[in-house]
């Protein structure tokens, strides 16, 4: 895989999505990039071993709620995810919190427009999962 400038890719994706460039601060490509959202958990973007992950921690109480909403959540995951490698989102536990993750398919890393598709898609899933877990 050729060198990926994740900071520039994220900046471009945010601009393509309509974010005012003056609202985008300095982005450090050497650490996890965190996009703070209103009324939703932050979206994190990180690179590990040349793979790009988009993820969000859904909250400490989410593990308990997961037991109550497992069927609904599983059905959402089984719908598939076009921008994720393997076509599936992942749920895991990280630091005691339920975490929604997507390993971004390389086809969505070539430019800001394609990455914005992945980023916006993840945002939409985050809304669905947050709504399910916060009911």
UniProtKB/Swiss-Prot annotation:
Keywords: Chaperone, Virulence. SUPFAM superfamilies: Type III secretory system chaperone-like. Coiled coil: none annotated. Gene3D superfamilies: 3.30.1460.10. It comes from the Bacteria. The keyword Disulfide bond does not apply. Belongs to the SpaK family. Homodimer. Involved in a secretory pathway responsible for the surface presentation of determinants needed for the entry of Salmonella species into mammalian cells. Chaperone specialized in the storage of effectors within the bacterial cytoplasm, maintaining them in a secretion-competent state, and allowing their immediate delivery to target cells upon contact of the bacterium with the host cells. Has been shown to chaperone SopA, SopE, SopE2 and SipA. This is Surface presentation of antigens protein SpaK. It comes from Salmonella typhimurium (strain LT2 / SGSC1412 / ATCC 700720).
């Amino acid at each position: 895989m050729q060198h990926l400038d994740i900071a520039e890719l994220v900046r471009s994706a945010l601009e393509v999505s309509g974010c005012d460039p003056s609202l985008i601060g300095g982005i450090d490509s050497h650490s996890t990039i965190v996009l703070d959202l209103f009324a939703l958990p932050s979206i994190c973007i990180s690179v590990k071993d040349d793979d790009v992950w988009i993820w969000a921690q859904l909250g400490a109480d989410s593990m308990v709620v997961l037991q109550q909403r497992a069927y609904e959540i599983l059905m959402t995951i089984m719908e598939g995810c076009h921008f994720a490698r393997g076509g599936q989102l992942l749920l895991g536990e990280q630091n005691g919190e339920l975490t929604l993750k997507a390993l971004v398919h390389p086809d969505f890393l070539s430019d800001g427009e394609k990455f914005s598709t992945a980023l916006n898609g993840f945002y939409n899933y985050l809304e669905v999962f947050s709504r399910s877990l916060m009911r």
